[in-house]
Amino acid sequence: YSFEPSEINFELLKLNIKSKANIKAFKYGASSKDQKIVLYTLSNSDSGHSSVLYSENSNINFDNKETIDLVNLDNFLNKNNISNVKFIKIDVESYELEVLKGTQELIKKDKPIIAFEQLINGLKNHTSDSINFLKKNNFNYFYETDFAKRKKYRFKIFYIFSTLIHIFKVIFIRNYNQTHKIKKINNFEIKDYPIIIASPEDLQK
């Protein structure tokens, strides 16, 4: 299951999964509650560079916007009889905490592995709101992988798919490409983390 609220990204997503009958796409974003919200984008940049957290003090001059639909994932999954979720990938440009707040029932019941982006501006005292939220919900193991260093793609969505496939293989196929391994994070450095993998269990046992 894939969620993408942006019009252009959703069209790219449909092209990517056209031959994959086992992938279902929904034109929604995820949040702590169901709502409509404005998504700000850059028309002359890759289509993944967008945010719902617009600030006039930002060093990014967004020049385009669209109204998108956000859903609480717990409610959405219950309404659509979706269960047994074992892996979640989140890339929402500093909106991670709101997404996580909408998955509290899911993470308590299914205990999925969660991969998310953590930007440096959200890290304070070697932690963040998202990391603290996960720790309070018994996610005590955090990892990074060298594959998460961003490659150059015309559209960010292609990078996301490439990284997602790799992370899935590293976690669930233990003998996959041993040149790329996950590394446990014992102390969060003050830096950008393209991918953090959070788990309620030790993935290196």
Identify the function of each model-found stretch.
Residues Y1-K205:
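Phosphate/nucleotide-binding beta-alpha loop and adjacent structural elements of enzyme active sites
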